[in-house]
């Protein structure tokens, strides 16, 4: 994924991210009110992303009865979002507004790398959640993942994410090449962080591959899983309505799946503008007006980073006990286990047998 900030009115050697331009004209500078608005928006996302995901992680890990497959994957998703909040937002905002990199060569390589790892882990955490829901509802008598499987899956997706992101670490460089032919004193000793791929074709292939691996492919798979789930639940509810009143159980099942699907939809909508922006700009630099590039980039990037807040927001709105524990969290109170009345979001303990039109329950899900 291409997270580099591209600038205007200054040619770059062909071997550095392919004829990228840099802004040296004051006419292209963002107005102060716009900078203030962007900084305020980024700050709000950082605060919400940090506090929300940190609270969600602590609350789930603190409660033993919440340590099931779905919640383990939710914690992994929140940790990935937390990492993105720390590594993506502040560095990208400062870099884009300053038009040069001030954080050194190590952070230049790590910033690109960690951002790519984070989004890969996030989407594949959603894939694993979809698989768990699919097996639970579509094939309840077959194989179902347990906590050990969830931990193994998390290890695999982190390894896969790191492998996919390695080219960004390899080819991210700190260079002053773009500023060497500029006579302005303000650009002396300034550096930019760019992706220096060996060939333009390699960069385009890699960017397109990441779009498929990080966005299109996983979302298509998730869509198929949840479509099958909702069709099965609809048929099951129709059967149960004819036999007995099971409105409470049906509403709980519906609420849980709506929450999980909302997280997926939120992720997809937030990241779509950013992926489109990168693809369009990578394949045709002239498609984006030079003076509008930085503003469009920041808006698309900010929209993508809002996804780091989606997880705790949807989890909180649709889980009453999370709201209650969240109040304890911000009041620095101790969390105490409530085994009798604690609501868990996962249905991993529920066993269903649709063929006999019965519902057997090993332990409460709510």
Curated annotation (Swiss-Prot):
The chain crosses the membrane at residues 40-60, 83-103, 112-132, 150-170, 204-224, 261-281, 295-315. Coiled coil: none annotated. It is found in: Cell membrane. The keyword Zinc-finger does not apply. It is a multi-pass membrane protein. Glycans are attached at residues 2, 9, 15, 181. Receptor for neuropeptide Y and peptide YY. PANTHER family: NEUROPEPTIDE Y RECEPTOR, NEUROPEPTIDE Y RECEPTOR TYPE 1. This is Neuropeptide Y receptor type 1. It comes from Xenopus laevis (African clawed frog).
């Amino acid at each position: 994924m291409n997270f580099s900030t591209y600038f205007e009115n200054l040619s770059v050697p062909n071997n550095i991210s392919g004829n990228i331009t840099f802004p040296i004209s004051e006419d292209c500078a963002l107005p102060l009110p716009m900078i203030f608005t962007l900084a305020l928006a980024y700050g709000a996302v950082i605060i919400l992303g940090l506090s929300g995901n940190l609270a969600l992680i602590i609350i789930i890990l603190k409660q033993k009865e919440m340590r099931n497959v779905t919640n383990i994957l939710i914690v992994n998703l929140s940790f990935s979002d937390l990492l993105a909040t720390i590594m993506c937002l502040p560095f990208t905002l400062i870099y884009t507004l300053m038009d040069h990199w001030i954080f050194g060569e190590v952070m230049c390589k790590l910033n690109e790398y960690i951002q790519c790892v984070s989004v890969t882990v996030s989407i594949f955490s959603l894939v694993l959640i979809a698989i768990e829901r699919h097996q639970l509802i579509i094939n309840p008598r077959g194989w179902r993942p347990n906590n050990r499987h969830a931990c193994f899956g998390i290890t695999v997706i982190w390894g896969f994410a790191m492998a996919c992101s390695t080219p960004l670490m390899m080819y991210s460089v700190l260079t002053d090449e773009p500023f060497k032919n500029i006579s302005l004193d303000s650009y002396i000793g300034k550096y930019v962080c760019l992706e220096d791929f060996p060939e333009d074709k390699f960069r385009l292939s890699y960017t397109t591959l990441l779009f498929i691996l990080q966005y299109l492919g996983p979302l298509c798979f998730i869509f198929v899983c949840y479509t099958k789930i909702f069709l099965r639940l609809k048929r099951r509810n129709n059967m149960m309505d004819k036999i007995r009143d099971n409105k409470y159980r049906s509403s709980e099942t519906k609420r849980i799946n709506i929450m999980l699907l909302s997280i997926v939809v939120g992720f997809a909508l937030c990241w779509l503008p950013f992926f489109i922006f990168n693809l369009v700009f990578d394949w045709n630099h002239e498609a984006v007006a030079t003076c509008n590039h930085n503003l469009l980039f920041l808006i698309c990037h900010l929209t993508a980073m809002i996804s780091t807040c989606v997880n705790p927001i949807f989890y909180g709105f649709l889980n009453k006990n999370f709201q209650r524990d969240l109040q304890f969290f911000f009041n620095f109170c101790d969390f105490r286990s409530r085994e009798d009345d604690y609501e868990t979001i996962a249905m991993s303990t529920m066993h269903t047998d649709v063929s006999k039109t019965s519902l057997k329950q090993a332990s409460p899900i709510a």
